[in-house]
Amino acid sequence: MKHFILAMVALVQLSCATQNSSTNEDNSMKKLIKTDQPIYIENKTIDEVIDFTSYLDAHLISEGVYQVNVKSGITFKKCVFKKPVSAFRKMEDGSVVLTSFQGNVTFIDCFFEEDVNFRGSSIYGRTDFTNSTFDKSANFEELHCHENAFFNKCIFEGALRFQNAFFNQRVNFMNAEFYDTASFQNSLFNSELQFSAGKFFKYADFTLIDCRGRVLFNYTEFRDKADFSHSIFAQDLGFINTKNHTTNFDSCRFLGKVRFNNLEVVSALSLTDSYFMFDIPEINIPSEKLMNSK
């Protein structure tokens, strides 16, 4: 009985110490950000809400839009986030608070158990979420990445939103898996876009994207509909060995070389009203599955 009581006391003390450690860690991170010191956290389970908009005073940048300016480099490796992680906040009066990161934003080999929201964030350093898992929704709408951005080997279990995003340098989603809807509508990619060997299990929205560099979707699987309609591909597009259900490239402009070799198409591939600056690529699929302009 004595040993049991001692064990229980030890567990209570350990629990309290863990809670205090998590709270203290959050407080110390806030202090570091306030003093522009870099953040580096590895192999931690974080049971606190991470809200970058709450660590610094926000300043008005336009009507109804405020912004905090984080000068610290942010690095998390092999961490588990039990609560939401956010760099966006909507206030009761309808105004919003965004976050500008002057350094890198790095979450490598991390696991997010709740929603992640970087809507409207500007990241002036490297963006790196390599090999991280998003168990709930991930919102990167209107994200501005000024350096290379890495989302390779990521797993997105919930809905993914990248509408109206801007990428100034290379973007890498190689070997990423998307288990819910994924939208990149109206996003601009100023350099190479890499999606090779990705897997989309639900609707993939790439309508109205503007791709200024080379685009690679080789060996990618689209289990549901994929829509690239009304998009611009200024340089080469690689779409080799892809597996498609219903894929639309209607009203697109292809200004570089296009490769559609060895496609698998379950339902249809549509290129209606699309323009090719060079020769129309050879597409070896049954004619009834290929839709072209008359």
Regions flagged by a language model, labelled:
Residues 2-8, 14-294:
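Intrinsic low-complexity/IDR segments
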